[in-house]
Design a protein with these regions (language model features):
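Sparse, context-dependent recognition of short Cys/His-centered cofactor- or disulfide-binding micro-motifs
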Residues: 3, 53, 88, 92
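Intrinsically disordered, low-complexity serine/threonine- and proline-rich regulatory segments
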Residues: 1-13
Length: 126
């Protein structure tokens, strides 16, 4: 599916699944169309809607969402290619444990970090 269809299906909560690389792809596609704040709001709204529709509104984690967006948007700066080419150029983004370089488990797993974005306590985000 192309980026436009992906964003439409994400916004309409009609994606059949939403694994890690789909999260990255939505950020990649949306950040080509909007600034950082609008991209964050788009993902926040969509993921919250998806979690609620799946009967698990508590699954949303604001710090994880915003941190991943910031990592993808920073890596995307100046990039002109497809999503697959982007992932090939930035294989570190495939690592689901990448946030561990920026956050301690105590902070990342806290209720406060789940509810509101927390700045990292290990290494700054871009």
């Amino acid at each position: 599916m192309d980026d436009d269809e992906l964003l439409e299906r994400f916004a309409g909560n009609t994606l059949p699944a939403f694994p890690h690389e789909e999260h990255l792809h939505v950020v990649f596609a949306q950040s080509a169309r909007a600034d950082l704040d609008a991209t964050i709001n788009f993902l926040r709204d969509g993921i919250r809607k998806m979690a609620a529709a799946n009967g698990n509104p508590g699954a949303y984690h604001d710090t994880r969402t915003v941190a991943w967006i910031r990592l993808v948007v920073a890596a995307r700066a100046g990039f002109d290619g497809t999503f697959d080419e982007f992932l090939d150029a930035h294989p570190e983004l495939r690592r689901r444990d990448l946030l561990d370089e920026h956050y301690s488990p105590d902070l990342l797993n806290s209720d406060a970090a789940r509810a509101f974005f927390a700045e990292p306590d290990r290494a700054p985000l871009p």
